[in-house]
Amino acid sequence: MGAARIAPGLALLLCCPVLSSAYALVDADDVMTKEEQIFLLHRAQAQCEKRLKEVLQRPADIMESDKGWASAPTSGKPRKEKASGKLYPESGEDTGSRHQGRPCLPEWDHILCWPLGAPGEVVAMPCPDYIYDFNHKGHAYRRCDRNGSWELVPGHNRTWANYSECVKFLTNETREREVFDRLGMIYTVGYSVSLASLTVAVLILAYFRRLHCTRNYIHMHLFLSFMLRAVSIFVKDAVLYSGATLDEAERLTEEELRAIAQAPLPPVAATSYVGCRVAVTFFLYFLATNYYWILVEGLYLHSLIFMAFFSEKKYLWGFTVFGWGLPAIFVAVWVSVRATLANTGCWDLSSGNKKWIIQVPILASIVLNFILFINIVRVLATKLRETNAGRCDTRQQYRKLLKSTLVLMPLFGVHYIVFMATPYTEVSGTLWQVQMHYEMLFNSFQGFFVAIIYCFCNGEVQAEIKKSWSRWTLALDFKRKARSGSSSYSYGPMVSHTSVTNVGPRTGLGLPLSPRLLPAATTNGHPQLPCHTKPETPALQTTPPVVAAPKDDGFLNGSCSGLDEEASAPERPSVLLQEEWETVM
């Protein structure tokens, strides 16, 4: 079995869930603030009061026969209708018996809209879904006495209601809080580590001119998109969580929820939500640009492999516009639609189908990048089979293919597709916890992995750092010896007994000499320096040594110094393609 047979199987295994789950959510980050919770409560109150007005205006005989407001007794087996959330008795039960006497009138208790209550029965209503932290599988209960009045709490002038099933998440939240605290710690540490490592990587690639080429420019854009994504997440969290949010709401009791709901709806000022809306907008934009620069990396590598003639400088501008400009278009469309049709809160909650304006382009980039990844892995497997034809060691082929695949996975964001087919479920579910831990871990540390693989582990980067370190240590050693006035000075590990005063301006002072390049041979008692000529001339003739970059398995393999120079059309793609093969082989 050849190594090339792995690619079709891998494509069949992974493409099916990707293509069949384009409806899945991407980086759902709904944050419920206290102000938004109050808004939802008041909206539910307005809807309830409208319905109450319609019902109370009907004649008494219509009210008593209206099953839409009738509630079932606890003695019968209830049947819940999901559309309306009301309970009806099973067929065969005497529905007329529960209307004997005066029914309890429907009302709004600042939490729930209660229907007509049958005298002497307990009314059960599903916990409202507009209370974010309620247990939406539970029920709230009220009792209607035989006089047609809602039962009061003994010794208190208020209506009795049992919300214990609804508030169980509020009173028994230790496990859930531990999960959220752990997830918050994971992504905070991950994005912090990624931000620090990516900052160093960008500074390295920008500082060394020999590393300036199209490939590294694209890497720098990708690194910058990861950095801006991390910063935008920190800013968004600081803005949204600066006031009273769910941390406070989770500790609220039923009475405190009532007090919040009874408060008048605060006036919505145009400037009250500007800060959080700007933070959410920039977060969504930088999130989208990060996905699209990952796609740009895939398109660039795919173009080098499959395009015979590829102008890097020309396509660099196109990639730049694609990576930064295209996300700005659909994010601007989303902002316009949200401001026009759903201008409520901080825009952090998904407003129906409007979320697809941003999520569909992101999902498309993930699917397209995964297809490019599968195609490149297929070509790698084919090349491995051709180069190792006639050899019996298939395990080495598999190891090379696995290594190449693992190197490409962070660059192509392959981990995004693992849970694409899995919808978000209950917080207490095991699958949800596994999914969130996986996503928080890999999404936050992806920038760190990319910086390690494509910068710090790159041979050319390491060579440039070693050269710079050698220059700095050599210059420092000369300065130290010059200040001390010693009769000896060192070139790296070797010591010359020539007086410092005999070192002229042409003796190579401060040249980028690497200690490992200095041979131990001596001439006339002096060490033989690189490019040193025998003294037919009175002064040493030295030239800066050229340090060859070691062969590297990283994506940055090969010197950038010759990549952007003019070359003939047939020669240029072959050189680039060979470098990319050495990247992943």
UniProtKB/Swiss-Prot annotation:
The keyword Hydrolase does not apply. Pfam families: 7tm_2 (PF00002), HRM (PF02793). Its main location: membrane. GO terms for cellular component: plasma membrane. Residues 1-26 form the signal peptide. InterPro entries: GPCR_2 (IPR050332), GPCR_2-like_7TM (IPR017981), GPCR_2_extracell_dom_sf (IPR036445), GPCR_2_extracellular_dom (IPR001879), GPCR_2_parathyroid_rcpt (IPR002170), GPCR_2_secretin-like (IPR000832), GPCR_2_secretin-like_CS (IPR017983). A motif (Important for interaction with G proteins) lies at residues 469-472. Residues 66-100 are annotated as: Disordered. It is a multi-pass membrane protein. Glycans are attached at residues 147, 157, 162, 172. GO terms for molecular function: parathyroid hormone receptor activity; peptide hormone binding; protein homodimerization activity. It is found in: Cell membrane. N-glycosylated. Keywords: Cell membrane, Disulfide bond, G-protein coupled receptor, Glycoprotein, Membrane, Phosphoprotein, Receptor, Signal, Transducer, Transmembrane, Transmembrane helix. Residues 27-184, 236-277, 338-356, 424-435 are extracellular. The modification Phosphothreonine is found at residue 543. Homodimer in the absence of bound ligand. Peptide hormone binding leads to dissociation of the homodimer. This is Parathyroid hormone/parathyroid hormone-related peptide receptor.
